[in-house]
A protein has these predicted regions:
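Long, contiguous internal "core" modules enriched in hydrophobic/ aromatic residues
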Residues: 1-191
């Protein structure tokens, strides 16, 4: 809420509108943790950010990240081994993907118009071994998700579930999604 954490170019009315939307989402929520907060912390006007993030839309989270000062963005990106512009581009791509999925859009053979920036090879060589991962098809998007999950939830079974899904449906046209034949052997997928 404190404008000191946000970029000086963010207009206060824009920032306040975002906060009002987030507050409204929290007020509407019937989640158990929200009910607990309301009953136990009656003197607290606002919930902690981790709690608020649970009820915010992806678009609101993305907007909040974009409004942060560069220093704050860098700290968040660094915590998952990325540079801030790379993380912002990934969040933008994932916002596009999320909206496409919500509207039942076809993605499997689509060229992704909101392309994620790939990290520099010297910072993240796993995106380049054995070959560079392209950023315009679903394999690139799935690869960045794989990387992010390895950083924030290393115990996640999502990579194994994706592999099982593709094994269960061998007729899925992987080439249209830019999956290389040996994708399972790529450094990123063996983390």
């Amino acid at each position: 809420r404190d404008l000191r954490y946000f970029h000086p170019n963010v207009r206060p009315d824009t920032h306040n509108r975002l906060l009002q939307e987030c507050d409204e989402a929290f007020r509407r929520s019937n989640e158990i943790f929200v009910q607990h907060f309301r009953t136990k912390y009656t003197s607290e006007p606002y919930p902690p950010l981790w709690m608020m993030a649970e009820v915010m839309t992806y678009g609101q989270l993305f907007t909040m990240y974009r409004q942060l000062r560069n220093q704050e963005q860098k700290a968040i990106a660094r915590s998952i081994g990325l540079q801030a512009p790379v993380l912002e581009s990934w969040l933008h791509t994932l916002n596009y993907i999320r909206n496409a999925v919500a509207h039942h859009a076809r993605l499997w053979n689509r060229q992704i118009p909101v392309r994620p920036m790939m990290p520099a090879q010297r910072h993240r060589p796993e995106f380049y071994t054995p070959l560079p991962i392209a950023n315009d098809r679903m394999f690139g998007v799935l690869s960045l998700l794989r990387y992010m999950l390895s950083q924030v939830a290393p115990q996640s079974q999502w990579p194994q579930r994706l592999i099982s899904l593709l094994d269960d449906y061998p007729d899925i046209p992987r080439l249209s999604m830019d999956f290389p034949e040996d994708w399972r052997d790529y450094s990123l997928w063996t983390l």
